[in-house]
C-alpha cells in the first residue's frame, strides 16, 4: 500500500498574490498522474485573469479534449487550479473563501473518518478481515471520529459484525436504507 503523497499547487499572479490548491490524487500512482495533469493544464492559465474563475471552468470543461469525459486525473487537475483561483480571489477581495461561496452555514462541522478500507492513522494496508475493519473503526473512534465512511458495503458489514458503535455514512455507489 502506497503512502500519502499529496500534490499541492501554487498559482502566482502578476500582482504578487498566490493561491494554493490540491490535486486530489494522493495515494498510489495517482500523485504522479496529478503532477502530469497540472503540467499540462498550467500553460492554459498563464496570462489570464485569475479572478474570472468560471471562464477557466468553461474552458477546461468544454474546450479541451478531455474536459467532458476526462475522469479522475483530469478533474483533479481542474479542481486544484479552481481551488487556487478561489484562494486568490478571497485574498484579492479581503474575504474568506466561504463568504464568496455563499457565507457560513454552520458554527461547527461534523467530520468523519474516510477510506477506512485502507486502515487508519499511520498504518496503511488493505483491510481483509472483519477484525481488521473493526480495529480501524476503533482507532478512528479513539480520536473522536464518531462518523465513519466506508467505500464498500461489504466493509460496513464486516466492521459491524465485530463493532456496533458506529454511525454509517455511505457514498453514491452504495445503497443502505438507514432509518
What are these regions (language model features)?
Residues 70, 74, 78-82, 90-93, ...:
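Short capping loops/turns at secondary-structure boundaries
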Residues 108, 112-179:
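Metal-dependent enolase-superfamily TIM-barrel catalytic cores that perform enediolate-based chemistry
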Residues 12-92:
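Metal- or metallocofactor-binding catalytic centers and their adjacent structured scaffolds
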Residues 82-118, 143-146:
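Glycine-rich, aromatic-flanked loop segments that form ligand/cofactor-binding clefts
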Residues 9, 14-15, 20, 52, ...:
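Ligand-binding pocket scaffold of soluble enzyme catalytic domains
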Residues 5, 17, 42, 57, ...:
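Generic secondary-structure boundary/loop-capping signal
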Residues 1-10:
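Short, Gly/Pro- and small/polar-rich lid/capping loops
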Residues 40, 80-83, 87-88, 99, ...:
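Alpha-helical scaffold segments in soluble metabolic enzymes
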Amino acid at each position: 500500500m502506497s503512502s500519502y503523497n499529496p500534490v499541492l499547487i501554487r498559482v502566482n499572479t502578476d500582482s504578487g498574490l498566490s493561491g494554493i490548491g490540491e490535486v486530489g490524487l494522493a495515494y498510489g500512482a495517482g500523485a504522479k498522474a496529478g503532477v502530469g495533469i497540472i503540467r499540462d493544464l498550467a500553460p492554459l492559465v498563464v496570462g489570464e485573469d485569475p479572478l474570472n474563475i468560471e471562464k477557466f471552468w468553461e474552458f477546461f470543461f468544454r474546450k479541451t479534449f478531455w474536459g467532458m469525459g476526462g475522469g479522475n486525473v483530469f478533474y483533479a487537475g481542474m479542481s486544484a487550479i479552481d481551488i487556487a483561483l478561489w484562494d486568490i480571489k478571497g485574498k484579492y477581495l479581503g474575504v474568506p473563501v466561504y463568504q464568496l461561496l455563499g457565507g457560513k452555514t454552520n458554527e461547527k462541522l461534523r467530520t468523519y473518518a474516510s477510506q477506512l478500507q485502507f486502515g487508519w492513522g499511520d498504518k496503511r494496508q488493505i483491510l481483509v478481515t472483519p477484525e481488521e475493519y473493526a480495529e480501524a473503526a476503533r482507532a478512528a473512534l479513539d480520536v473522536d471520529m464518531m462518523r465513519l465512511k466506508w467505500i464498500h458495503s461489504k466493509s460496513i458489514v464486516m466492521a459491524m459484525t465485530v463493532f456496533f458503535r458506529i454511525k454509517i455514512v455511505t457514498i453514491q455507489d452504495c445503497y443502505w436504507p438507514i432509518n
